[in-house]
Amino acid sequence: APGEQEDIHGEPFVGRAGKLLDKILTAIDRSRGDDVYICNVLKCRPPNNRDPLPSEVEQCESYLHMQIKLIQPKLIVALGRVAGKTLLGLDVQLKEMRNETYEYTGIPLRVTYHPAALLRNSNFKAAAWDDFKWIRSFLEKN
């Protein structure tokens, strides 16, 4: 879901989490716009930056699915539990979704930590970096 800065600018990942995501993308030789398309599960900001309610996700889900259908990415990377849960239909902890390649409408999908979680808890950074190294390797091969 968009945060305060994203809501103001009308673009995903423009705040602190977005800056961190840009650094991670640069580290794996990727960049926004050129070969990375970023979108949110929720298209509007929940009050007080809370997690989206299931009813809110349901209202926006068809837009997300249409974006994916139009873009036809080589790989979908779900950033965070909400994105993973929405795309996979699994109600489990993020750590249970990581390190496995799923399929979403025939497109490989991986789940990793949301950059905001990395800002809140640096203990997740090594695992997230492993995820992004896997992403780099996958994209180099495909």
Predicted regions: what they are:
Residues 1-142:
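A polyanion-binding, active-site-adjacent surface
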